[in-house]
Swiss-Prot record:
Family: Belongs to the class-I aminoacyl-tRNA synthetase family. MetG type 1 subfamily.
Name of the featured protein: Methionine--tRNA ligase
Residue positions binding ATP: K331
Gene name tied to this protein: metG
Motif, 'KMSKS' region: chain positions: 328-332
Length: 679
């Protein structure tokens, strides 16, 4: 029976490029989806960019552009990289969409109606230099449980989770400053009220790998579940919570809802009903994720889905991390390789195959050993699989395929009989097992060609029928391998289809040989991977890292150069020129609108004692008058008074910015006194 499957990979964060570590997941998912489609199942591969949060806001601010510009540019780059590796999504969206906003409202209302949301004041880390509350990812410190230094803001490598305020010696990664603790109102989901449901789902649904279920039962479900902090105060880039103005949904609330929102976009474009994919017992929901985001997808997410009436995950496929040469990916070693850089040097099919040889259904880290990579790809793909076609391809273009399938010693039928076992391995996520089984078939097929010696038959006119038979067997065995490898190597499957004049579209094509047809001109199927190409790739990665480090050293906060371009530095002046300008600290005693002026506010500034100045400042679009009263500002106190039709202006308030709403009055630290000169 045809199955219907909704498949997702974790949404890549729109704050940086795709690298080979990310690709473990997207290739794993793509392989599984392609297998399901090859088997005739109806399968949607849904993804989107994860676009909200403080990181996006901070980066956009530093680059002098809007968050929208940043996430749109990043989305284009992500999709370009994915396409380069043959990763085919049925739909790729963005969490910053109206569909996602609507669904967030809907699910939020469900949580409210279920009495799962509470509000309370919490202490939160605040960066006094960056002037923002710090998300977990922007804090590092010593784990309060095991004492390991330089750990993330919300969890340690030891498996312990905590609040950022519990960290020992916390440091802001935005500015390097020591954060201070400030109180803010936050909204929480009371997960403990869902404890019984989550415990039952984790233990008995079959959705989780055994090691994952045991981890959750031992680390989380054995105790009372902590409330989930679901909101963040302004400033924050995201969706404002409709019934809590000034507060925004935490990125981990709206990000997984993006799975549903992207499906909604696909449904709208294809005339389908979202309920058939997210509220139907006839549809399976499969999530592929990394082990670092396990508890978001296995506790918070099922709780949200259950409460809002959406389908629960049928399976959460969790994978480990990528190491290179037995170590963590390293920029200094050149092993932190961007997808774009890899594509400049190496055939992406090589990485697709290598990852497939390493992936299993278990939560295990993968190791990309450079020497092993070269050996495995060249030996398996070029030396075995492609070798079958390349040794007879040119001859077959002349002879065509035999009218009936020749005697091959049972090779084709034996390979056909392995189809179910290979399919079962794919289905279970045991890609490494599937690759081993396929290579065993390649090992059995190659001796047939070696013993037949078609290159010698080609020299003898009387042996052309024999040559045609050998070509027929060899190309059909090659085609079987291409079908079995099609989920992993779609480009090779396409070339096989082009050669034999029949595209590979179904797993069942592995069960019946092709006969009595012509063969197209043989084209080179795959090149060997060269060690020097890998070395060049890693050298380029080192250079990229060095350039980024150099840029960070001269501009550690990633400040944009656009303001300087808009208003270049003025000509040099002497200290005597500067001393002519009398800058003074002043306090705003009163502020009011000027009805006749669109841009001006009328300010009365106190310089201490009875000394005051009346100033007209072009800051109306940026400031409410009442919010200025009492502030300390810096004014030019010796500017010649200027008579205006609204009154006399006796100075100037200093401010930065291009104008309009983007005007920022210069302040001064507390302790300074009105009347003091600014030197």
């Amino acid at each position: 029976m045809t199955r219907r499957l909704l498949v997702t990979a974790a949404l890549p964060y729109a704050n940086g490029p795709i690298h080979i570590g990310h690709l473990v997941e997207y290739l794993q998912t793509d392989i599984w989806v392609r297998f399901q489609k090859l088997r005739g199942n109806r399968c949607l591969y849904i993804c989107a960019d994860d676009t909200h949060g403080t990181a996006i806001m901070i980066r956009a601010r530093g680059e002098g552009r809007s968050e929208i510009e940043l996430i749109e540019e990043t989305s284009e780059a992500h999709q370009r990289d994915f396409a380069g590796f043959g990763i085919e999504f049925d739909h790729y969206g963005s969490t910053n969409s109206e569909e996602n906003r609507t669904l967030c409202h809907q699910i939020w209302k469900s949580l409210r109606d279920a009495d799962l949301v509470v509000e309370r004041s919490v202490e939160q880390l605040y960066d006094p230099e960056a002037e923002t509350f710090l998300a977990d990812r922007f804090v590092r410190g010593t784990c309060p449980k095991c004492g390991t230094p330089n750990q993330a803001g919300d969890n340690c490598n030891c498996g312990h989770t905590y609040s950022p305020t519990e960290l020992i010696d916390p440091v802001s990664t935005l500015s390097g400053a020591t954060p201070i603790i400030k109180e803010a109102e936050h909204l929480f989901v009371e997960l403990e009220k869902l404890h019984d449901f989550l415990s039952e789902w984790v233990s008995n649904s079959g959705a989780l790998q055994p090691e994952t279920a045991n981890y959750l039962k031992g680390h989380f479900l054995a105790d009372e579940l902590r409330d989930w902090d679901i909101s963040r105060p302004a400033p924050y880039f995201g969706f404002e919570i409709p019934d809590a103005p000034g507060n925004y949904w935490y990125v981990w609330f709206d990000a997984p809802i993006g799975y549903i929102a992207s499906t909604q976009q696909w449904c709208d474009a294809n005339g389908e009903d979202l309920a058939d994919w997210w509220k139907s017992d006839d549809c399976e929901v499969h999530h592929f994720i990394g082990k670092d985001i396990t508890y978001f997808h296995t506790l918070f997410w099922p709780g949200m889905l259950k409460t809002a009436g959406f389908s629960l995950p049928t399976k959460v496929h969790i994978h480990g991390f990528l190491n290179v040469n037995g170590k963590k990916m390293s920029k200094s070693d050149g092993t932190f390789v961007k997808a774009e850089t890899f594509l400049k040097h190496i055939d992406p099919s090589a990485l697709r195959y290598f990852y497939a040889t390493k992936l299993s259904s278990r939560v295990e880290d993968l190791d990309l050993g450079v020497d092993e990579f070269v050996e495995k790809v060249n030996s398996d793909l070029v030396g075995k699989v492609v070798n079958l076609a390349s040794r007879v391809g040119k001859f077959a273009s002349r002879t065509g395929l035999a009218p009936s399938y020749p005697e091959d010693g049972g090779l084709f039928q034996a390979a056909a009989a392995k189809g179910d076992e290979i399919a079962s391995a794919y289905e279970d996520g045991e890609f490494s097992k599937a690759m081993r089984l396929i290579m065993e078939l390649a090992d059995a097929a190659n001796p047939f060609v070696e013993h037949a010696k078609p290159w010698e038959m080609n020299k003898a006119p009387e042996r052309q029928d024999e040559l045609r038979d050998v070509c027929t067997v060899a190309l059909n065995l090659f085609r079987q391998l291409a079908v079995y490898l099609a989920p992993v190597l779609p480009e090779l499957a396409k070339k096989c289809g082009d050669l034999l004049g029949e595209p590979i579209t179904s797993w069942e094509q592995s069960q019946t040989p092709l006969v009595d047809r012509g063969v197209n001109k043989f084209q080179r199927m795959m090149d060997r991977v060269k060690t020097e190409d890998l070395e060049a790739m890693m050298e380029e990665s080192k250079d990229e890292a060095a350039q980024e480090t150099g840029a960070a050293a001269t501009n550690p906060f990633n400040d944009s150069d656009q303001p300087l371009k808009d208003e270049p530095l003025a000509d040099e002046i002497t200290i005597d020129d500067f001393m002519k300008v009398d800058l003074r600290v002043a306090r705003v005693l009163s502020a009011e609108h000027v009805p006749e002026a669109n841009k001006l506010l009328k300010l009365t500034l106190g310089l201490g004692g009875d000394e005051t100045r009346q100033v007209f400042a072009g800051i109306k679009a940026a400031y409410d008058p009442e919010k200025l009263v009492g502030r300390l500002v810096v004014m030019v106190a010796n500017l010649k008074p200027r008579k205006m039709r609204f009154g006399l202006s006796e100075g100037m308030v200093t401010a930065a910015g291009p104008g309009g709403e983007e005007v920022f009055v210069l302040g001064i630290d507390e302790g300074a006194l009105p009347g003091q000169r600014v030197h």
